[in-house]
């Protein structure tokens, strides 16, 4: 909800508002919503959304999934304090290559083959990596210089290490669920008039935004209950 205008041909400014949503990827319900000026960075709105979920909703959430625009250390720390795991795309930010590790921060062997993510120990918050499959026929395998298992505590660097580990198939599968947020955004804009806010004052625009999110959740709840009843009738 923003608009750009030219000022003296060279300068531009933004006015308007922005809605920030925390969406359940499985249910597609809006769990938490925040209304702000159009200039607020999405990353700065994330921690209030996370705290709102923790304080008001008692849900057995395991992961917080976000794109690279939310790759900030404070967000990882907040998710960790909530007892959950961050599945956030990594924004490299001109960082140099780390010797001894691949692009997903998994350790590599002498021949630069990546160790494979094996498991996560929640008690010690430790990721376990095992030997690469290439070690089976490597001449260095029996020389005693290659480590069979690597263990890394996720708290050593919350940005780089999470459970499941970056680059693993499990991590990729969880990250794909983030598309649910885009679907909800599309629903709100196309069917609930969120893309057609005509108010210039923040108070009225916020009421419009709150009503849209409330009506969406109510409609979703009604549709889900009807589906449950229909399924029960079919079984009976």
Question: What spans do the regions from the language model cover?
Answer:
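Alpha-helix capping/termination and helix-coil
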Residues: 54-57, 72, 83, 142, ...
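An anionic, glycine-rich sequence signature occurring as long contiguous blocks
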Residues: 81-199
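Acidic/polar loop patches that form or flank catalytic/metal-binding clefts of enzymes
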Residues: 61, 87-88, 223
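Basic, amphipathic alpha-helical segments enriched in Lys/Arg and hydrophobic/aromatic residues
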Residues: 169-236
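Short, solvent-exposed polar/charged micro-motifs at secondary-structure junctions
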Residues: 74, 97-98, 208-210
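Short, low-complexity, polar/charged sequence segments that are solvent-exposed and flexible
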Residues: 40-41, 52-54, 83-85, 105-108, ...
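Polybasic low-complexity intrinsically disordered regions
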Residues: 1-81, 91-94
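Residue-level marker of positions within ordered structural domains that often coincide
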Residues: 26, 51, 143, 193, ...
């Amino acid at each position: 909800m923003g608009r750009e205008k030219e000022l003296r041909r060279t300068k531009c400014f933004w006015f308007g508002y922005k809605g920030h949503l925390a969406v359940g990827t499985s249910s597609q319900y809006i769990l938490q919503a925040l209304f702000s000026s159009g200039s607020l960075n999405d990353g700065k709105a994330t921690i209030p959304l996370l705290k709102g979920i923790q304080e008001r909703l008692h849900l057995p959430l395991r992961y917080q999934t976000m794109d690279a625009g939310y790759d900030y250390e404070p967000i990882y720390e907040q998710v960790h304090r909530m007892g959950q795991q961050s599945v956030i795309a990594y924004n490299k930010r001109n960082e140099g290559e780390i010797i001894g590790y691949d692009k997903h921060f998994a350790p590599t062997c002498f021949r630069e083959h990546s160790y494979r993510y094996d498991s996560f120990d929640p008690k010690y918050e430790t990721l376990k990596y095992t030997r690469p499959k290439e070690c089976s026929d490597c001449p260095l395998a029996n020389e005693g210089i290659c480590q069979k298992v690597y263990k890394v505590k996720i708290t050593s660097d919350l940005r780089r290490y999470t459970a499941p580990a970056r680059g693993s198939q499990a991590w990729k599968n969880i990250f794909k669920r983030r598309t649910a947020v885009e679907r909800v955004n599309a629903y709100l804009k196309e069917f609930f008039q969120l893309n057609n806010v005509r108010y210039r004052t923040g108070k009225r625009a916020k009421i419009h935004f709150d009503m849209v999110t409330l009506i969406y959740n109510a409609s979703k709840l009604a549709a889900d209950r009807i589906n449950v009843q229909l399924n029960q009738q079919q079984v009976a």
